[in-house]
Amino acid sequence: MGLVLGLKKQFQKFLVRTFFEGAKKTKATRDFANATNQNFEELAMYDRDMLRARARWLSANNPIMSNIDSTIINNVVGRGISLQSVDDTLQEAWNTWQKSCDLTGRRTLNDMQRLMLQTRMVDGECFIYKKYTKNGFKIQLLEADQLDTYAGKSGLDIDKDGKVTAYYFKTDGDTVKIDAKHIINYHKSNRISQYRGVSEYSRSIIDIKNFQGFTSANIQSLRARANIAYAVEGDDVNPFDYNATDQDGDKIQEINDAFVFYLNAGEKIHTLDSNATPVNYQEFVQSTVRMIATGRNISYELAFRDFSQVNFSSARASILQDNKRFDSEQEHMITYILEDLYKTWYEYEVLNGREAVELPVVSWVVPVREWVRPKEDLSVVLEMVDRNLSTYTDAAKSRGKVFEEILVQRQAEEALIKKYGLNTEEIQNAITKA
């Protein structure tokens, strides 16, 4: 009786294991052979370097991936996410610092913002070293290759609470341990157990490589057919006896400036099909690029700069979704990098050892997002403000401005107009005529 109950329980467990279709082991699911439930870092440590190397190759050699990166960077960072403060002294001090904040003296903070985002997308992560020097507070960008992954846990020290306490970096053959408070590890996490980044190309590497291979094969095929325009054929003839000649008795070498390829010596001539291109090539390109764009979380239209397949409403809907991604990226960079740098800079450069005071509130101005239909979009913004669904501050920020600065500038302009005895209408007419 016990044996029967035992077999029954085993059978019930088997039924439970196979209840979900997605968990069944069949020929169709053989590609899931490497699917396993492990700590993220245990899984990623073996593939991270290879993914990074392949992503760098694609970034340098593939125009589609390069265009996607450039599109994201131009929309997220543009000419730089800038600090705005009503305190002129603070504003001027920050502007001066951000022009010379690079420890290596090669880049401004705006340049570094673009490079940080580019590196994070391709490599998966970027390290920012906050260093205090005799020349003031500086920052240095470090690549993932410089992390000594053989020290600590993949280059990190993690305490019992799961907090990173130190990083290990390679320098001149030695390994240097740097306290975590001096390092910003700029990456995006997809799992709770993740501490380091993985290339954002990881979902698209195979698709883009297959696309390149398919395109290259078709181009080579067409080039070969274009170079061999005619063929001479013959039956039951010695293939080494090339005796096909023209009217002067010379062997035929080319026809209409195209080389002739001899299959066998003979007299029958026909043209090869130089237009043998797969009829579904365009569909293949579009579907592949859509898949790549989806893997990069961006619309096909923006990734391929192709709006010919959609109407205005569909294009606008795609742009709105892309803008949400850009908004998220901007918030991520401001929260994890710029606010951290601002706080550290203020404590070191402004306070300079003096008693700490409350950190002055500042605004971060993102690149101007151009309107698709300026008049209609402006009307919508003004109506939202009138209906208390938005504010002038938010409206100004969306145009890369600070509302208070606009008011100050407007006040100065009004005073200038009054000084010269003019009115607003005359100024507008003068600008229109100019």
State the predicted function of each range.
Residues 80, 97, 101, 208, ...:
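Generic structural signal for hydrophobic core residues of well-folded globular domains
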Residues 90, 94, 285, 289, ...:
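Short amphipathic alpha-helical coiled-coil/interface segments
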Residues 187-314, 318, 362:
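Extended, charged amphipathic alpha-helical segments
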Residues 109, 130-133, 221-227, 303-307, ...:
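Short coil/turn segments at secondary-structure boundaries
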Residues 2-5, 267-278, 282, 315-326, ...:
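Activation/maturation switch segments at domain boundaries
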Residues 60-195, 384:
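Structured, mid-chain assembly/scaffold modules that mediate subunit interfaces
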Residues 1-77:
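N-terminal-proximal low-complexity accessory segments that begin disordered
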Residues 106-130, 277-375, 379, 424-427:
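C-terminal amphipathic alpha-helical
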